Amino acid sequence: MSTAIEDPRAAARDDWARAATGQPDLALARASADAGFRSYWRATVPGQGSVVVMDSPPALEDVRPWLRMHDLLERGGVRVPRVLARDTDAGFLLLEDLGADTLLHVIDAGNADAHFDAAIDQLLRIQAIPAPDDLPHYDEALLGRELRLFDEWFLGRHLGVQPGCGDLEALDLAYRVLIDAALAQPRVLVHRDYMPRNLMPVDGGLAVLDFQDAVAGPVAYDPTSLFKDAFLSWPPERVEGWLLRYHARALDAGIPVPAAPERFLRDARLIGIQRHLKVLGIFARLHHRDGKPKYIADAPRFLAYLDDALPLHPELAPLAGVIERHVRPALATATAAAG
């Protein structure tokens, strides 16, 4: 039995790509998949070079939010992949091929300053674009739902920890601090996953990927995501230097960051703590619900970020206590069992 018969989606993808390129014999090869339901397929078009097909099954992941944000960013001067053909009903896009290596693959201690300057270039362009009135807001409800991913998926499902009433109260108090701090920040267009794996070196600069979940939210969110990455870590002193570099350039560009660098660094730490807790929950959910175990291996990185930030915020001592009482013992037990 042929692959096309076994997988109707594959047959539809092949047929669409061949029609879109005018190449009846076009062969697609998997390029990558992401943490959602989209997949990417590469092909070579004679006389034109390589192209990429984005496959976003409509019943699982609507392609329209991606396209809407793509077009908004492109109009604002942000470098994004060019869309060569689109079929929103079927969930297929034909994109320019930006290559196989994201910034995550090429950045290192020696070239990080130059690459992060290029990343700041694109981020300032994003933040200068007025957020559409109907764009979702990083509001109290969304911030709270994200924080509860830590309780449900990382503590409960992954570590098997069932916090008692006192622990839940401690988390509630800490979450209140984090939510209030986020809501007090100036609001801009927020990518929500602005980090090296979603940036592509191209044309002497960087192109931006994976922007479909953008919201209107805290100005410190994206720079914090950039320098406190999910997949690689930098010395704290370099992170602070890059945050201050971003802050100075943002002030010059008219982005509504606080004038005082110390206040901006505080905002970055607090929104970073919120993000680290959320990501721990998301990585655990990807592992246990979605069968994608590779992400949870980076959990220690986020605990290290929390170790750096929490001592600077005594108002978050209840959260630090929960981590000491429950997270570290559970991880130690799991590590011993695995060894």
Segments (PLM) and residue ranges:
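Secondary-structure capping and boundary motifs in well-ordered enzyme cores
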Residues: 115, 186, 191, 215-216, ...
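Active-site activation/catalytic loop segments of kinase-like enzymes and analogous catalytic loops
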Residues: 151-158, 220-256, 270-290, 302-310
